[in-house]
Structure formats: structure tokens, C-alpha cells
Design a protein with these regions (language model features):
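Short, flexible active-site-adjacent loop segments at beta-strand->alpha-helix junctions, enriched
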Residues: 9, 61, 120-121
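A general structural signal for well-ordered alpha-helical segments in protein cores
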Residues: 22, 64, 95-98
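N-terminal low-complexity, Ser/Thr- and acidic-residue-enriched intrinsically disordered segments
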Residues: 1-54
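Charged, often glycine-rich, active-site loop that binds/positions anionic groups
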Residues: 48-73
Length: 310
């Protein structure tokens, strides 16, 4: 299991959970490497260049210029942060981590999981940021996967953040990305959208037990044969209504089902704020649970892949 991250993920001067927590998760990966075998890697130079090119191609030129220069400030700070030069670096490196993970994951034919400690993605569309999100690495990653031949059928974006992924829906709709479907389970109606076709949005108001039942039902209803890549936006902000243990069970359900379907998966971080967890360390620990859940699935994949290669 390889998780992508470098210190440019935390380049912005603006200190907020979204711009700082990935470093703590990265520290946990390094500290536990000998025990878990999970590797931390920086996005490769070729993917940094590819990410910058994709951002320049897919995003509105006015928004790209604003992210680079801070002008106009209303657009440059549309993500909710004060602009500084680190915003652009963060956007490029965070996006590069997603596409690097997609590239590496697709190379394994019997289902596999990799991740990027990218966060602040799904409220941004291709014209502006919103809700602490700057560049939508989910949508950019899906575009990269399809156009580079890593997903020859369709890409499924599973978004289990507390809030709706309206930015993702706007992005893929405005660019006519009909090879992307979105499965969105939220606990809060912020950034909601009208789901049509193969897209689905469920806003769940119940308790933890019914939430996990909803996760299982939604995963069971997916036409998995339609897809050859899954991108998982692993939000931890359904907490505190959903406990830390409940979120871990949810991640196990997601990764187990993807394993059963022998599909490649790339996950990113989402949600998770000190306002509901108490400390940034608790936020990082909960995100790390997602990393550990993905590693447990790889323990199941390894013997399966080995037997298939005999």
C-alpha cells in the first residue's frame, strides 16, 4: 500500500484543519511503517507536470489565474481561505498525488487500493472553490483515468463525506464527463444537487445503525460491472452522529465490497474538523483508521492475486 503526500500539501500559510491535518496523518504512516508496511511517497515529478497541465486545461482560465496570482481576490479566496502562493502549490501537489495513485493502482489487475492524503476537493467545481475546497482532485482524477486509458469503461466516485459533493457534480456535468457516476451519501444537505441518470444522492438523517445499513444497501445496488475504477472520498465529518467506530465499519464495508468486485480503488481524505473531534490529533487518528482499513483489504488481495498469477 502506497499513500501519496509531500509537504506542499500543507503549503498554504492559512492554518486550518483542511490545510494542516494531512501532515499529522503522514507522520502516523511513517511512525507505524515497520508494523504496517504502509509506504509514504511523494508524487513523482512527471505527475506534478501532468497535474498542472490538467488543472490548466480543465479549470476556467480566470480561476487558474486567480489561484496563481491572487487576483481577483474574491475568486482566489473562493475556497474560504486567505490567498497566498502556497495555495497553488497545494492544488498541484494534491492533484498529482491522486493521479499518481490512480496510475499505480491500475497497474495491478486483481483489485488494489492506494491513497493520497489530499483533502478539500468535492465542493470545488471547474470555475471556483467553495467550502474549504480548492481544486476538485476527484473530478480531475476521473478525467485523467479515462483519457489516459486507466479506466476504459466508467469511473465511480463514492462520496461519503457529511456534505454533498455538488462541486463534483457541477464539474463533471459542465465538462460532459458521462463516463463518471457519483454515489453520494451525506448527513447534511450543504452543497446538494439534483441527481439524475446513474448518479445518486442520499441525505441520511438517521442514527448510526441505519446509516451503516444505508451504506450496505447503496453498495449492494451498484452495477459494478459498469466500472473499472473507484475513487473514494472518505469523509470523517459524519462524526459525532456517527461514531469513530461506525466510520471504521463504513470504510470496511466500502473496501470489502470493492475487493469482492476486484476493482482498483484510490481513496482521499475528506471532512474531519476539530470543531467536532476536539483536537487535530483526533482528526488525524480517525483519518488514519481509513488508511488502516485499506491495508487490511490488501492483506486479503495479496494471496488472491498471487493465486491468479500462477
Amino acid at each position: 500500500l502506497t499513500i501519496y503526500w509531500d509537504n506542499k500539501y500543507v503549503a498554504p500559510e492559512h492554518a486550518f484543519d483542511t490545510t494542516r491535518k494531512s501532515e499529522l496523518v503522514a507522520d502516523l504512516i511513517v511512525e507505524t511503517h515497520e508494523e504496517t508496511g504502509i509506504a509514504l511517497a511523494a508524487p513523482k515529478i512527471e505527475f506534478l507536470g501532468k497535474a498542472e497541465s490538467l488543472i490548466e486545461t480543465l479549470l476556467d482560465p480566470k480561476y487558474v489565474e486567480a489561484l496563481r496570482t491572487g487576483v481577483p481576490i474574491s475568486l482566489a479566496s473562493s475556497n474560504g481561505f486567505e490567498w497566498d502562493e502556497g495555495i497553488w502549490d497545494m492544488a498541484v501537489h494534491s492533484t498529482a498525488g491522486v493521479i499518481n495513485a490512480i496510475y499505480e493502482t491500475e497497474k495491478r489487475p486483481f483489485g488494489s487500493v492506494n491513497g493520497s492524503l489530499s483533502s478539500g476537493l468535492h465542493h470545488a467545481d471547474n470555475k471556483r472553490g467553495m467550502g474549504f475546497c480548492t481544486v476538485n482532485g476527484l473530478a480531475v482524477g476521473a478525467y485523467y483515468a479515462h483519457t489516459e486509458g486507466h479506466a476504459k469503461k466508467k469511473v465511480l466516485i463514492i462520496d461519503f463525506d457529511a456534505h454533498c459533493g455538488g462541486g463534483t457534480m457541477s464539474f463533471i456535468t459542465s465538462l460532459g464527463m458521462d463516463w463518471v457516476d457519483q454515489l453520494d451519501l451525506s448527513t447534511n444537505g450543504f452543497d446538494s444537487y439534483v441527481a439524475a441518470g446513474n448518479h445518486e444522492l442520499v441525505i441520511h438523517r438517521g442514527d448510526e445503525r441505519s446509516y451503516l445499513q444505508e451504506v450496505w444497501s447503496l453498495l449492494d445496488a451498484v452495477e459494478w460491472d459498469d466500472y473499472d475504477l473507484v475513487l473514494y472520498n472518505a469523509g470523517i465529518d459524519p462524526h459525532p452522529r456517527i461514531s469513530v467506530n461506525g466510520l471504521a465499519q463504513r470504510d470496511e464495508l466500502v473496501f470489502n465490497r470493492i475487493f469482492q468486485e476486484t476493482l482498483p480503488c484510490v481513496f482521499v481524505l475528506a471532512g474531519g474538523y476539530t470543531s467536532s473531534y476536539g483536537t487535530i490529533e483526533e482528526v488525524a487518528d480517525t483519518h488514519f483508521n481509513t488508511v488502516l482499513a485499506s491495508e487490511r483489504i490488501l492483506d486479503l488481495i495479496r494471496p488472491f492475486a498471487s493465486s491468479k498469477s500462477l
